[in-house]
Each structure stands twice: as C-alpha cells, then as structure tokens.
Amino acid sequence: MLFAVECVYYHAMNTPEAVRMVLDTIASPNLRVICDLANYVGPENASVDAQRRLWDKVGSWYGDKIAAVHFKGQSFKPDGTLCSTRLEDSCVDYRGGFEMLRTLPQPVLPVLREEAVPARAASDLAFMKSFF
C-alpha cells in the first residue's frame, strides 16, 4: 500500500523544505508525494523566477517520490487573497513545473484536474496537453 502527502501553501506542510522533512522523518518506501504545483505558490513567490527555484527543489529533493500531479488555476488579488482562475489565467508557472516533471524517472504520472468546470473541458484539455 502507498500513502501520499501533498504540499499545501496554507497548511503546515507548505514548502518543499517541509515536504522533504516529512519524507526524511518517516523514511518509508511506501510514502509518496502528490505534486500540486499551485499549492507551492503564494503571493510572495508567484514570480516565474521564484517558482523555478521551487521546481528545482521539488525535482531534485523528492521528484522520484511524486506519484501524481494535480492541475488547477489560481492567482492572487492585489491584497494577496487567493482566487481560483481558468488554467489560462493562472499565475502558476506550469511550463517550468512540467519541464521539471519531464525530467523525473517515472514512466507515467497521472494528472488530475482539480476544480474542473465541464463547460471549459475542451480548453482545459488543450491547455494541459500543451505541456506534454
């Protein structure tokens, strides 16, 4: 049986460092990571450069432990408040994130669309496919 943890910006395990600490502390071959790229991004690290540094850490520190990828759109209002967006309008650096994911040893990674809106399925699928 496998068990997976997920970094969530607004929770206790909210940075690559925190995920790495949990993985190192538990040290189980059955512990994996669900990688939701949006969950690593907050208003202070929403720039592409800051996100590329995050993706470098995720890939090098525990990329081989990633078992699935979540995909959702988000952005931040001027006051820093999180808001859901269409994938095309997201502040998430999906290009950089998927460049990192393509370097991992896993032959296949399931990608799960979160917060899906059926009316946008075609545009969501086209957007996601642009990274493969």
Report each predicted region and the residues it spans.
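C-terminal helical cap(s) of enzyme catalytic domains, especially alpha/beta-barrels
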Residues: P118-F132
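Alpha-helical elements of Rossmann-like donor-binding domains used by nucleotide-donor carbohydrate transfer enzymes
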Residues: A18-M21, K57, G96, M100, ...
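Intrinsically disordered, low-complexity regions of eukaryotic proteins
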Residues: V8, T81, A116-V117, A126
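H/E-rich (His + Asp/Glu) clusters that bind or coordinate divalent metals
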Residues: R86, S90, R95-G97, R102-L104, ...
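A short, acidic, flexible beta-alpha connecting loop/helix-capping segment that sits on the rim
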Residues: S75, V111-A121
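Conserved hydrophobic residues forming the short capping helix/wall of the S-adenosyl-L-methionine
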Residues: L23-I26, L101, F132
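Acidic/histidine-rich catalytic cores of soluble enzymes
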Residues: M1-C91
